[in-house]
Curated annotation (Swiss-Prot):
Subcellular compartments: Cell membrane
Binding site for Cu cation 4: H418, C489, H494
Composition-biased stretches (Basic and acidic residues): 622-631
Sequence similarity: Belongs to the multicopper oxidase family.
EC id: 1.-.-.-
Entry protein name: Iron transport multicopper oxidase FET3
Chief site of localization: membrane
Stretches assigned to the Cytoplasmic side: 586-630
């Protein structure tokens, strides 16, 4: 039999290449147990933090694209559930490993263990991981993740440094939650942090070599405040944002919201005679109040001479000179996605419900978690999975068709900035309007499809982006990753308030894909926490359109007056009228004073003075008590 080398050699090369790829791919296995320990993060105050195997901080990870990650996460807490999310990874084909509780998994009960097992097939760059339960990452349950490309990076550097930024609270999240989601905080004012930290400390020292190019991977792992970041007398060249390599863009300052990542190149000077300040600054426009003892800046040290003096803090002429990421261009120049097949328009509002607590809303709905994780509803609902109703009336669920171009128009009617994150995708930011100010008669300004800025030919792409106050953003992405994907504000306080929605992408394909099926471990985790892994948002498996018993948001404050309000107003008015009558009646009555009272008022001895007729004094209100001569 004659073998055609024309077909055989390419096949052999493909086989060898595939074998080499498999051979080079590694499996990274981690066994982590959560717990509590005391730690003084900023050098000023010791407080409980969440530990990993009794240690703090949590480990920073570095893997290569194509590698497999296996994390056995054991819940070592006594009194709370937990979960884990790898922020920015697409989890293509492994949606159940994404991590947000009640979205793609049941929460992990105390004493239970869940295996996160996935291959990083289509991501490289700078990422991070964190708990997706109750703001636990604000208590320290988080770390960075660097995914190296299979080939070389599209830029040169000598050394790599990971820089983790965050704000820090002295109270733990449980305490802050009780004060925040409370009738005594009706405006929804977010808790004010006590400090800015960098790499889980304050006033970090970074020893550098002269004439060296450093790659800084900068991650804001905080839960609230955006930060300005700059290094005294050093430019930064941006080369990557959120796992997307971009054309080089040089700046002196970055503006980094929570959950965003920037990779920058910094080339050090030849002169080692001076050390330089590394600066962080709160975006104080996000703070409702600024306490007198809050330091808005934090200074760390870039040391050319480790024995030299540490630098003083560095000032800038304007805080507005930061890089605008809207104008970054992806290195692979992905063209603007064509006109969308489906546009989702959502309006952001912050308001109070009937219980007096302040909530956040998309289109007048505040996200309320279902009784069954949404992914499990999508997998068990059959053809009903195409009906958004099965996912609940308070989850803001949208069902997407495979490979459609999706557009999200987000109108921010709030007076603050919001960083929004989309799980499972990177998106194009095709429009972001400037912020508007009610104080000068502006805003809010919703997006106008007939009157907007020209869309860029090659829009910036990332997975976390901010919207300005009382303004709008427009995002586009391709629905090419079947799964249930969370879209939410990454300010943890706003997520607690319900600023989130769900995108259920090609559920029928998920049902027919082997890698998307629940593992036995997933099912056991649900059973151990007392939850079902089948059913609609109400837990109903007989009729997926029957939502009786589902979780719903607190009732709205009713229009007009309730019966109690009418009664209260009636008696208040009656009390007011009676009060006016009393004032009028007693105010018009003459109040006679005795002679002795008048004399004592004048500071005289009653026994030493001649008795006089005081009727004239009592009858003349304007008379001075010293106007009569008493002899």
């Amino acid at each position: 039999m004659k073998v055609s080398t024309h077909h055989f050699l390419p096949s052999l090369l493909v086989a060898l290449w595939s074998w080499a790829t498999v051979a080079q791919a590694a499996t990274h296995t981690f066994n982590w147990t959560t717990g509590w320990g005391n730690y003084n993060v900023d050098g000023n105050f010791e407080r409980p933090v969440i530990t990993c195997n009794g240690e703090f901080p949590w480990p920073d990870l570095k893997v290569k694209r194509g590698d497999r990650i296996q994390v056995y996460l054991t819940n070592g807490f006594d009194d709370r559930n937990t979960s884990l999310h790898f922020h920015g990874l697409s989890q293509n084909g492994t949606n159940m490993m994404d991590g947000p509780e009640m979205i793609t998994q049941c929460p992990i009960a105390p004493g239970d263990t869940m295996l996160y097992n996935f291959t990083i097939d289509d991501n490289d760059g700078t990422y991070w991981y964190h708990s997706h339960t109750g703001g636990q990452y604000q208590d320290g349950m988080k770390g960075t993740l660097v995914v190296e490309p299979e080939d070389s990076l599209p830029f040169d550097y000598d050394e790599e440094v990971v820089v983790q930024l965050a704000e820090w609270y002295y109270d733990n999240v449980d305490t802050l939650d009780r004060k925040f989601m409370n009738v005594y905080n009706p405006t929804g004012a977010e808790p004010i942090p006590q400090n800015l930290i960098i790499n889980n400390t304050r006033n970090m020292t970074w020893n550098v070599e002269p004439d060296t190019t450093y790659l800084l991977r900068i991650v804001n792992t905080g839960g609230f405040v955006s930060q300005y970041f700059w290094i005294e007398d050093h430019d930064m060249t941006v080369v990557e944002v959120d796992g997307v390599y971009v054309e080089k863009n040089t700046t002196s300052m970055l503006y980094i919201t929570v959950a965003q990542r920037y990779s920058v190149l910094i080339h050090t000077k030849n002169d080692t005679s001076k050390n330089y300040a590394i600066m962080q600054k709160f975006d104080d426009t996000m703070l409702d109040v600024i306490p007198n003892d809050l330091m808005l800046n934090a200074t760390s040290y870039m040391m050319y001479d480790k024995d030299g003096e540490k630098p003083e803090q560095s000032y800038v002429d304007s805080i507005d000179d930061f890089l605008d990421d809207f104008y970054l261009t992806p290195l692979d120049k992905v063209e603007l996605y064509e006109d969308p097949d489906y546009t989702i328009t959502v309006d952001v509002v912050m308001d109070n419900l009937k219980n007096g607590v302040n909530y956040a809303f998309f289109n007048n709905l505040t996200f309320t978690a279902p009784k069954v994780p949404t992914l499990m509803t999508a997998l068990s609902a059959g053809k009903d999975a195409l009906n958004p109703l099965v996912y609940g009336t308070n989850t803001n669920a949208f069902v997407l068709k495979k490979d459609e171009i999706i557009e999200i128009v987000l109108n921010n009617n709030d007076t603050g900035k919001h960083p929004f994150h989309l799980h499972g995708h990177i998106f194009q930011l095709v429009d972001r309007e400037r912020g508007y100010d009610d104080a000068i008669g502006e805003g809010p300004h919703p997006f106008d499809p007939e009157d907007h800025n020209p869309f860029p030919d090659y829009p910036m792409m990332r997975d976390t982006v901010y919207v300005n106050p009382q303004s709008s953003i427009v995002l586009r992405f391709k629905a090419d990753n079947p799964g249930v994907w969370f879209f939410h504000c990454h300010i943890e306080w706003h997520l607690k308030q319900g600023l989130a929605l769900l995108l259920i992408e090609a559920p029928e394909e998920m049902q027919n894909t082997e890698s998307q099926q629940l593992t036995d471990n997933h099912k056991q985790v649900c059973e151990n926490v007392g939850l079902s892994w089948e059913g609609n948002a109400a837990g109903n498996t007989n009729d997926f359109l029957d939502l009786v018993g589902q979780n719903v948001q607190v009732a709205n404050i009713p229009d007009g007056f309730t019966a109690k309000g009418i009664v209260a107003m009636t008696f208040s008015c009656l009390a007011g009228v009676l009060g006016l009558i009393s004032l009028s009646t007693y105010g018009l009555m003459g109040v006679k004073k005795s002679e002795e009272e008048i004399i004592r008022d004048l500071g005289m001895d009653p026994d030493a003075v001649e008795k006089v007729d005081v009727s004239d004094i009592n009858s003349d209100e304007d008379s001075s008590r010293t106007s009569k001569n008493i002899e």
